[in-house]
Amino acid sequence: MTWLTQITMGSLFDGIGGFPLAAVRNGITPVWASEIEAFPIEVTKLRFPGMIHVGDITKLRGAELPPVDIICGGSPCQDLSVAGARAGLVGARSGLFMEQMRIVREMRLAEKARGRESVNLRPRWMCWE
């Protein structure tokens, strides 16, 4: 990627599309989003009709996703809260954070298998909320 090409983004735990909205306002193209809740998906379909909805993060394979320059995500945090049982990243909900890491690893391995140089592996940037 050079600075003269379009920067692209994928969004995990997309919700109502906060990351894609910020991306568009900054000249970045949202390519795909992962979300499981029906209402938020409908919102993002209206806001971003060209964005692909890829479904449940636990069922995704990073090598099969369209390559993007940036991945954003805000995984559930209930198990990290001091108000809860404090299960941490081994908790059922907050443990989904590790799915984000798996997706990035699988995407980068696929890029490497296609012959891309290590310094150019995508996604190049991650933004976790």
Task: Say what each PLM segment does.
Residues 1-129:
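Conserved active-site and SAM-binding loop architecture
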